[in-house]
Amino acid sequence: MISNPSLLSYTCIAKGTVVLAEFVSRQEPGIEAIALRCIENTPPHHSMFSHTVHKKTYTFAIDDDSFVYFSISDESMEKPESFWVLNRLRSAIEDLIKDGGSDVETLINPVSHCLQLKLDPVFAEIVGVVDLELLDMDLVGSPRSVARESRNPSIDSSKGRRAALMPLLGKPLKALKKKKRLHNEAKGGDSCEVGSIQEISEKNVDLCGNGNNGVLRKELRNGLLSDHHHRQKAKQIWKKHVWVVLMFDFCICAVLFGIWLWICEGFQCIQG
């Protein structure tokens, strides 16, 4: 369980651009559309990726087999903790694949939210929810929530929906405090490693600023060009420093050679 679930706005598992399961905070209506746009523009050639813009942190964990683990959180959430969320989702997928069965077949040609029921307990564990029905109230657009709303007409109105959506991300339950400590201890060992991974992989990319699907690719390309420019500039500065050192050494040698000639009055010392 994360220390403050209210800081987590969205998290999901996707294969390619198909969202297999997701958690959507009721405090962020419509954020899943932004998340899908980000997933469609997943940065290539990265295993871990994080960027903060407009007080939101967008974090990716990308596997070679096209699985993408993605989250949107408040900028105040610590980076190691946001990476822990994605690593927890990754371990859940690895367990499903290891167990085999129909779940593996489902992943061959996945459909939207095909693993929602399987992964609801994992989302509940992450945000510290005991009752999965409460968790499902935040899974906006999931098959279970749509079916439940169709059975309950009182939720169709905005007023009824607000009444039905009980506060999910409040203070942790007392019964979960021990569980929270255990999870904090378990993820503590990964903090240093995740933090170092984040530092070397973080790029300055605006993932969803104006809704343009080409924003991420454009900004990533600009970032790479900027990195190349900085490398070239650093190389030029290094060459300049080398030449300065060589010229300084040459001047010292010339002065010492002149002093030697003056003391010996030419090359008489050698002739003697």
From Swiss-Prot:
InterPro entries: Longin-like_dom_sf (IPR011012), Longin_dom (IPR010908), PHYL (IPR044783). It is found in: Membrane. GO terms for biological process: protein transport. One of its GO terms (cellular component) is membrane. Disulfide bonds: none annotated. Its main location: membrane. The chain crosses the membrane at residues 243-263. It is a single-pass type IV membrane protein. Residues 12-116 form the Longin domain. SUPFAM superfamilies: SNARE-like. Keywords: Coiled coil, Membrane, Protein transport, Transmembrane, Transmembrane helix, Transport. Belongs to the synaptobrevin family. Non-SNARE longin protein involved in membrane-trafficking machinery. This is Phytolongin Phyl2.2. It comes from Arabidopsis thaliana (Mouse-ear cress). The gene is PHYL2.2.
